[in-house]
Amino acid sequence: MDYLSLIKSPIHEELNDFVTLFNRSLSHDNGLLSRVLEHIRQRGGKRMRPMLTLLMAKNFGIVSEVTQYAAVGLELLHTASLVHDDVVDESNKRRGQASVNALFDNKVSVLVGDYILSTALLSVSYTNSELIVRYLSELGRTLSDGEILQLSNIDNTEISEEAYYEIIKKKTAVLFEMCAVIGAVSAGASDEEMAAARQFGQDLGIIFQIRDDIFDYYEETEVGKPTGNDMLEGKLTLPVIYALQSTGDEAMLALAHKVKQQEVNTAEIASLVAFTKAHGGIEYAEQQMAKRHAACMQFIDERVGDVAIKTALTAYLDYVIARKS
């Protein structure tokens, strides 16, 4: 099924307007800055988060100039965070292409990330909405908090779902959460509608991250990324956390602690992956996605009246679960 076409259908023109405004925001006359920004623009992406903002605005009213400036601000903040993340993670790839730090260097990456972040703040200032500016500021702080929390979690001997959810809510889900609620705010939604949109976004973001985490337990040829990559980076995700907690296997718990200290080898990771699959870790993670899928569908059933928007948001939700990368 062509989920993306269904998602874009009711916001096709608005999405084109967004892309134009976003690209204009990432233009500059300075030679070096211009080259870096052009590299970032060329990476493109599916625009999943801006589409969520536009759909929410259209659901509760119209996509206005306020919506567009807010959506651009959100995407710019997200882009800046990715540029900085690649420096922190020492990553040389982003969406299959060379990262900014790989193509240029860390100094350029940090400075360009700062420039994009400042541009995000400028964009949302054009909304003249104190609430939208506040939400975007809250988002930036929460994303940073999530990154620091994940770093500090390496030294935390506790392995728990609670710690896992705290990190993914701050690192991933909050972005979907704010895209949804800011879209609603831009359309003049009521407090009750904004709260519902925010919860929908958080549930959607959690589903997105759990699906991403499940990819790590399959071969690269199946999902497009190497098996056990998260564990190589010291991350324990929901499937293995469940398998460890449900069995209490001491040998595997010892391996899990080695993962957190990044002292594990590929053979040990393969053992943990096999252990997770054998003890229902994948199935449990899928059950958790299903629970949040049901909550998202309740929002769509109760809060979305327009058939085209209902179809688009349902396709969005289905795409997040069905995607292979």
Where are the regions that the model predicts?
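All-alpha prenyltransferase/terpene-synthase fold signal
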Residues: M1-S325
